[in-house]
Amino acid sequence: MKKALVAVMCSAMVLGAAGCGTSGNEVKTGEISNVEIAEKDVNLFVKDGTLTNTGATFILANNSDKDIQYDEPYRIEVKENGEWHKIDVEVAFIQPLYTLKPNETAVLEIGWENGYGKLPDGAYRLVKTVNYDDVENYESFDVAAEFTIG
């Protein structure tokens, strides 16, 4: 069933990875984010030495005792006056579904220039939604990696 679901999602929801984003080095700040980052055994962080204003390599680590699932979409938020704000941008993603086993990591090469443009100096976080792969106890939550440009 899971394989069929993945196949359907991959073939039916291919939207492309390009979006309508910002141009130049500006960030169009939106409303205050209501995302709550879960304190779970699943973590997201920037791999040392990979951060630029157009992308980075992120590590998604599953330190839990359960399989987790994740997909391509992410969002970037900017910190202003001590609060996280959404960045007004529309980005389309392909929709494959990945599974990460307990105590495994995944390397995520993320280039955001097509959607978010070149990020100016500031504090940001990349947010991804993941869920435990448990049909009886479905639980979806957000993980984030904070980073600073400049």
Model regions: which residues?
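Primarily secretory-pathway and cell-envelope proteins
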Residues: 21-94, 99-101, 129-150
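C-terminal motif of bacterial Sec signal peptides marking the signal peptidase cleavage site
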Residues: 16-19
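Intrinsically disordered, low-complexity Pro/Gly/Ser/Thr-rich segments with frequent PxxP/GP/PP motifs
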Residues: 91-117
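A short tyrosine-centered beta-strand micro-motif
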Residues: 119-129
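Positively charged n-region of N-terminal signal peptides that target proteins for export
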Residues: 1-4, 8-9
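N-terminal functional modules and adjacent low-complexity/disordered segments of proteins
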Residues: 8-10, 32, 125
